[in-house]
UniProtKB/Swiss-Prot annotation:
Induction: Down-regulated upon skeletal muscle denervation. Interacts with tubulin. This is Protein tyrosine phosphatase type IVA 3. The gene is Ptp4a3. Disulfide bonds join C49-C104. GO terms for molecular function: protein tyrosine phosphatase activity. Protein tyrosine phosphatase which stimulates progression from G1 into S phase during mitosis. Enhances cell proliferation, cell motility and invasive activity, and promotes cancer metastasis. May be involved in the progression of cardiac hypertrophy by inhibiting intracellular calcium mobilization in response to angiotensin II. Present in the small intestine, where it is located in the differentiated epithelial cells of the villus but not in the proliferating crypt cells (at protein level). Expressed in heart and skeletal muscle, and at lower levels in lung, spleen and testis.
Length: 173
C-alpha cells in the first residue's frame, strides 16, 4: 500500500500560546509522533478525528490525549469549542508558553479551525487568524469552515480578571 505524503507538523505561536498542528499518526508511526511532541514540548494532544492509534504509549510518556472528534470538513460543535477554550484557558494560564498539540486526519481542517478559534478568542481578527495559520499550513481551512469562522463571535473566553488590579487581561499575555 502506498504511503500518503503528509505535511510536517507546524508550530503556531501567538503571545504565550503555542500549538502544534499535525496529522494523525498510526500505531506504526507513533514513535515518530511522540518524538515530534517532545521536540515541541507538547504534553497535551487534542484528537478531533476518529481513533487511529493507541494512546497508551503517549500516556506512558506523560502526554495527555483528549478525544473531541467531530465531522471532517465541518465546523466544531459548540461543546467541542467550549471544552477546547476551557482547556486552553487552564493550560496557558497555569503554564504560559506551553504547547498544545491538535490533530485531525491531515491537519488541514478541523485542527487549524480550533487553533483559529483560540487566536480569535485572544483578540485576533478572524481574517488575520486564517492568514496567520495558512502562512504556516498551506491549504488549511475549507470554505465551510471559513464561513463558520467569519460568522463566529468571540466572547473573549481566553481572558480573565487580574485579582490584583481587577482589570481584564488576556490569559496568554
Amino acid at each position: 500500500m502506498a504511503r500518503m505524503n503528509r505535511p510536517a507538523p507546524v508550530e503556531v505561536s501567538y503571545r504565550h500560546m503555542r500549538f502544534l498542528i499535525t496529522h494523525n499518526p498510526s500505531n506504526a508511526t507513533l514513535s515518530t509522533f511522540i518524538e515530534d511532541l517532545k521536540k515541541y514540548g507538547a504534553t497535551t494532544v487534542v484528537r478531533v478525528c476518529e481513533v487511529t492509534y493507541d494512546k497508551t504509549p503517549l500516556e506512558k510518556d506523560g502526554i495527555t490525549v483528549v478525544d473531541w472528534p467531530f465531522d471532517d470538513g465541518a465546523p466544531p460543535p459548540g461543546k467541542v469549542v467550549e471544552d477546547w477554550l476551557s482547556l486552553l484557558k487552564a493550560k496557558f494560564y497555569n503554564d504560559p508558553g506551553s504547547c498544545v498539540a491538535v490533530h485531525c486526519v491531515a491537519g488541514l481542517g478541523r485542527a487549524p479551525v480550533l487553533v483559529a478559534l483560540a487566536l480569535i478568542e485572544s483578540g485576533m481578527k478572524y481574517e488575520d487568524a486564517i492568514q496567520f495559520i495558512r502562512q504556516k499550513r498551506r491549504g488549511a481551512i475549507n470554505s465551510k469552515q471559513l464561513t463558520y469562522l467569519e460568522k463566529y463571535r468571540p466572547k473573549q473566553r481566553l481572558r480573565f480578571k487580574d485579582p490584583h488590579t481587577h482589570k481584564t487581561r488576556c490569559c496568554v499575555m
